[in-house]
């Protein structure tokens, strides 16, 4: 009876004492236990002194005590009553889940996003419209300036050009009248044959015609001379078209042909700096220019003109797409440069 009471008094009352006694019976130190359990020595000391660290949750503390008990061969059933007193399991208080209006917040966020998107879109459209209007206004001002310059140049050229003086045609009329009058001494029949068979003589000044005296020719000699002149005149007349064809000028290889489908302001300058044309060209008209290549062109409305250079059309589509004043150079190799 006394032995059982003594045994109960000597029995440890806490988990820390029970684990410390078991460790000492195995001859282990706190350092060895800490190394085997991968814990700090201070944590092992707190467990043996029944201290619960403030920064350590009860769940972790119960796990450390169970690991310590397995290491020193102490049954867990022996430690459970003491463990329940030392590190009671705290029931987690689960707070009721608050319901959030996710749909409303999402709609609100989407509304802000859409508003920002529309704002950016309006800004981009406004900037694009302002840029286009500035370019259009600048082009119109440039076209009006060029038209004013061309009008001033045309008026200045008209003021500086000399007035045309009519030619005196009295001497020519007298000469033609003298040549048309036949000599009075010739017979009428021979005169008609001579006038019909002989080629028309080259006109000479009226003073020489008036000073010459008519020559009387016998009828037989007049007929002979007329036949001879007729025979010699026919080969010369047959060779005349060949000579005219051989002397016809060749077409200009640098010819510039422009057809206008609407009113268009135009300025064309050749390689020497000479302005071949500068002014307003009306609808349904064409313009043929010739000069020294390359040509420098400035066209106010590229969509209103069709250009052919060296017999080939010139592409103006890039200027038509951007709706801007066309500035280009046509060189001898049929290439277009801006």
Curated annotation (Swiss-Prot):
Membrane topology: Single-pass type II membrane protein
Cellular component terms (Gene Ontology): plasma membrane
Composition bias, Polar residues: 147-180, 189-214
Role summary: Cytoskeletal protein that is involved in cell-shape control through regulation of the length of the long axis.
Species the sequence originates in: Cronobacter sakazakii (strain ATCC BAA-894)
A Pfam family: HTH_25
Keyword DNA-binding: yes
Lineage: Bacteria, Pseudomonadati, Pseudomonadota, Gammaproteobacteria, Enterobacterales
Residues annotated as transmembrane: 112-132
GO biological process: regulation of cell shape
Ranges where the record places region Disordered: 147-245
Location of the HTH cro/C1-type domain: 19-71
Positions on the Periplasmic side per record topology: 133-338
Biased composition (Low complexity): 220-239
InterPro entries: Bact_Cytoskel_RodZ, Cro/C1-type_HTH, Lambda_DNA-bd_dom_sf, RodZ, RodZ-like_C
Keyword entries, A-Z: Cell inner membrane, Cell membrane, Cell shape, DNA-binding, Membrane, Signal-anchor, Transmembrane, Transmembrane helix
Name of the protein in its database record: Cytoskeleton protein RodZ
Cytoplasmic-side segments: 1-111
Cellular compartment(s): Cell inner membrane
Domain notes: The helix-turn-helix (HTH) motif in the cytoplasmic domain of the N-terminus is involved in the formation of spirals to maintain the rigid rod shape. As this protein is anchored in the cytoplasmic membrane, the HTH motif may contribute to protein-protein interactions to form the RodZ helix, which is localized beneath the cytoplasmic membrane. The C-terminal domain may be critical for determination of the rod shape by probably interacting with enzymes required for synthesis of the peptidoglycan layer, including PBPs in the periplasm.
Keyword Transmembrane: yes
Sequence similarity: Belongs to the RodZ family.
């Amino acid at each position: 009876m006394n032995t059982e009471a003594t045994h109960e008094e000597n029995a440890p009352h806490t988990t820390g004492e029970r684990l410390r006694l078991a460790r000492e019976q195995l001859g282990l130190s706190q350092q060895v236990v800490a190394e085997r359990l991968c814990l700090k020595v201070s944590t092992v000391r707190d467990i043996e002194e029944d201290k619960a660290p403030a920064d350590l949750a009860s769940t972790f503390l119960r796990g450390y005590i169970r690991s310590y008990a397995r290491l020193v061969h102490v049954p867990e059933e022996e430690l459970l009553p003491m463990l329940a007193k030392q590190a009671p399991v705290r029931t987690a208080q689960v707070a009721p889940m608050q319901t959030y209006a996710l749909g409303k917040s999402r709609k609100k966020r989407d509304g802000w996003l859409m508003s920002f998107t529309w704002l950016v879109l309006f800004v981009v459209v406004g900037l694009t419209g302002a840029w286009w209007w500035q370019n259009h206004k600048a082009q119109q001002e440039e076209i009006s300036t060029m038209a004013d310059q061309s009008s001033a140049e045309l008026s200045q050229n008209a003021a500086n050009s000399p007035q045309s003086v009519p030619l005196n045609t009295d001497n020519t009329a007298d000469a033609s009248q003298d040549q048309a009058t036949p000599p009075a001494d010739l017979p009428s029949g021979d005169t008609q044959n001579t006038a019909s068979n002989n080629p028309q003589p080259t006109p000479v000044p009226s003073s020489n015609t008036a000073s010459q005296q008519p020559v009387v020719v016998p009828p037989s000699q007049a007929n002979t001379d007329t036949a001879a002149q007729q025979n010699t005149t026919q080969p010369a007349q047959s060779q005349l078209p060949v000579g005219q064809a051989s002397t016809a000028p060749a077409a200009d290889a640098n010819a510039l042909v422009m057809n206008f489908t609407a009113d268009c302001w135009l300025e064309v300058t050749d390689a020497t700096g000479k302005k071949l044309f500068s002014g307003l060209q009306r609808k349904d008209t064409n313009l043929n220019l010739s000069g020294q290549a390359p040509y420098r062109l400035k066209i106010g409305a590229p969509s209103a003109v069709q250009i052919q250079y060296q017999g080939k059309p010139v592409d103006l589509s890039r200027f038509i797409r951007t709706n801007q004043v066309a500035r280009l150079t046509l060189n001898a190799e049929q290439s277009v440069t801006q």
